[in-house]
Design a protein with these regions (language model features):
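Amphipathic alpha-helical packing segments from all-alpha helical-bundle domains
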Residues: 72-76, 122-148, 154-158, 184-187
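Helix-turn-helix
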Residues: 19, 23, 27-61, 65
Length: 198
């Protein structure tokens, strides 16, 4: 009986979490990150403000509540995308192209995510986000290590991640971000980067 009550309680928590995610995504998309309030989000999700704060400390934390689950799944797909035998630049591009296509599906929310993740170090969702980001960087480092570059693979992986992050922000800032254009530009940048490692 206790196990049944526990599973019912767990399902209720997951349902509440999902209502909060959906409400925050809708209000951020419709009104913008700055205009949407925690109170509006709680009302839309049919939860009390205290319940909302159990899931996210502030609006920034809510952005990551919206994205962390999808970002984790997208990162799984991205890290499996490179094919053995591809040049390093193409392997890296295979990883990042998955993220471009995913973010292109929801550019308004993607802009908020990319704006808010700078210096995101505290909050209920922060550790999850940092874990996902580290998995991505570790995956990049693994590709760099296999390519046997002269420089320290960890340093090169960080450099690659910085190029990707800046390129992604540049692309998503356009009025209608087309993933094909963003990926094509990133390909050129990655080829330049890899050529500099020889």
């Amino acid at each position: 009986m206790a196990g049944h009550q526990s599973s019912v309680r767990e399902r209720k928590k997951l349902a509440t979490r999902e209502r909060i995610r959906v409400a925050a995504a809708e209000l951020f998309t419709r009104h913008g990150y700055g205009a949407a309030t925690m109170r509006q989000i709680a009302r839309r999700a049919h939860v009390g403000l205290g319940t909302l704060f159990n899931y996210a400390e502030d609006k920034r934390d809510l952005v990551f509540l919206i994205f962390n689950e999808e970002l984790n799944a997208t990162t799984d797909v991205a890290l499996a995308a490179p094919r053995p035998g591809q040049p390093l630049a193409e392997q890296l591009l295979a990883v990042f192209a998955v993220h471009y296509r995913w973010l292109a599906e929801q550019p308004a929310l993607a802009r908020i995510l990319l704006q808010e993740l700078t210096f995101y170090s505290s909050g209920k969702q922060a550790a999850t986000f940092h874990g996902i980001r580290q998995r991505l960087i570790d995956g990049i480092e693994s590709l760099v290590r296999k390519a046997k570059v002269k420089e320290d693979p960890a340093l090169v992986a960080r450099y690659v991640f910085f190029v990707y992050s800046a390129s992604l922000r540049w692309w998503i800032a356009s009025p209608r971000p087309d993933p094909r254009h963003g990926i094509a530009e990133l390909r050129r940048l990655l080829r330049l980067l890899v050529a500099g490692l020889r």
